[in-house]
Amino acid sequence: MGKRLISQNRGRGTPTYRAPSHKYKADLRHPRVDENSSLRGEVVGIEHDPARSAPIAKVAFENGEELFLLASEGIAVGNIIECGDDAEVKPGNIVPIGNVPEGFFICNVESKPNDGGKFVRSSGVYATVVTHEATRTAVSMPSGNIKWLNPKCRAVVGIVAGSGRVDRPWLKAGKKYHKMKTRAAKYPRVSAVAMNPRDHPFGGGAWKHPGKPTTVSRNAPPGRKVGLIAARRTGMKR
């Protein structure tokens, strides 16, 4: 008798396939600030968060609130961070993108005003302010896509810290394993053609080949719905 596929087991929501979110430090959001004012805070620590690739900064604000914010390059313990419409445009400060001069780098950009930050949050990435109009601001994303946003959307001035992460190799499988354990991912991933026939429709056989067409209908049952699902075309483009 066959077994459930990994894609079927994921849907059950067991701990194997769930992210250990109880270990995550905080949900990073820009602090709420009244219009035409600013809020100052001091960086009291730089910490690691298993939920993300970039370091986070613990900031104690003058209103008594302590928050974790995404750390930008150059931030250090003891630095002062400003947030609000009146904040100076310098690395680490949180300002509306409408106040940022063209050509400046920004990160942790809001999609809508006061949503806390949605875009450009991975280590070492940044967006660029391209141009301003009366009711919108153009921002060049890391992908090269130009996004038009409300000028009241806030962002952190500068580049996300931790830019050298992708240049450092893992070297040991154990380190990669423990990193993947912090995410909702099963690791290591076994190729379908390397499995037994009871584990996957593409498994079994004397050599590693699917043994059947890899295209499958959109309406196929869960145990068969693997491979190129409802593919319009297959193979290399000519």
Curated annotation (Swiss-Prot):
GO terms for molecular function: RNA binding; rRNA binding; structural constituent of ribosome. Gene3D superfamilies: 2.30.30.30, Nucleic acid-binding proteins, Ribosomal protein L2, domain 3. Keywords: Ribonucleoprotein, Ribosomal protein, RNA-binding, rRNA-binding. GO terms for cellular component: cytosolic large ribosomal subunit. Signal peptide: none annotated. Transmembrane segments: none annotated. Residues 1-11 have a biased composition (Polar residues). GO terms for biological process: cytoplasmic translation. InterPro entries: NA-bd_OB-fold, Rib_uL2_dom2, Ribosomal_uL2, Ribosomal_uL2_arc_euk, Ribosomal_uL2_C, Ribosomal_uL2_dom3, Ribosomal_uL2_RNA-bd_dom, Translation_prot_SH3-like_sf. The keyword RNA-binding applies. Residues 1-22, 202-223 are annotated as: Disordered. Part of the 50S ribosomal subunit. Forms a bridge to the 30S subunit in the 70S ribosome. Belongs to the universal ribosomal protein uL2 family. One of the primary rRNA binding proteins. Required for association of the 30S and 50S subunits to form the 70S ribosome, for tRNA binding and peptide bond formation. It has been suggested to have peptidyltransferase activity; this is somewhat controversial. Makes several contacts with the 16S rRNA in the 70S ribosome. This is Large ribosomal subunit protein uL2. It comes from Methanosarcina acetivorans (strain ATCC 35395 / DSM 2834 / JCM 12185 / C2A). The lineage of its organism: Archaea, Methanobacteriati, Methanobacteriota, Stenosarchaea group, Methanomicrobia.
